[in-house]
Amino acid sequence: MQLAPSAEMIGWDTTALGLPNANLPFDLGVFTQHLEIPGVWLERGRIDASDDRLLNSPLGFAGHKCMASIFFVTGSALTRERREKALDAARAVLNTHPLKLTSGATCPNDHVVVVRVLAPLVEPAVNLLKQVWAAWRQELWQIKPNAPRIWSM
């Protein structure tokens, strides 16, 4: 992603590791993920299906089959007050959500606020991301959280 100095965006990434309800596990291959704002933020991950410790230990994914992130990024540095507003809005959602124990919000630098979540399936993770998206739109941009029509499919 490349952002102009005045740009702001909310984006997300959701990854399902296999299809658990179809008994099609992620048990072969490697998944590599790369999210970047050059010079500002770099997320890079590599998940090997044979890495049982990562996928199943309590210090890793603890058997969860979905990982997801939502991020608020800006082309110019956010003020501390705005970063705190974004974190507070996200944490208010997380604290009341069923996935609160496997989710968290952080601010790795003054251009990025990130929420990450692990879930047993995609749907609960996406539900959480939608709630954070709505909270951020309202708190950061004073825009009503009108969901895109495609979300109703």
PLM ranges: what are they?
Residues 1-4:
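Intrinsically disordered, low-complexity linker/loop segments enriched in Gly/Pro
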Residues 13-153:
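A structural signal for small-residue-enriched, beta-sheet-centric alpha/beta enzyme cores
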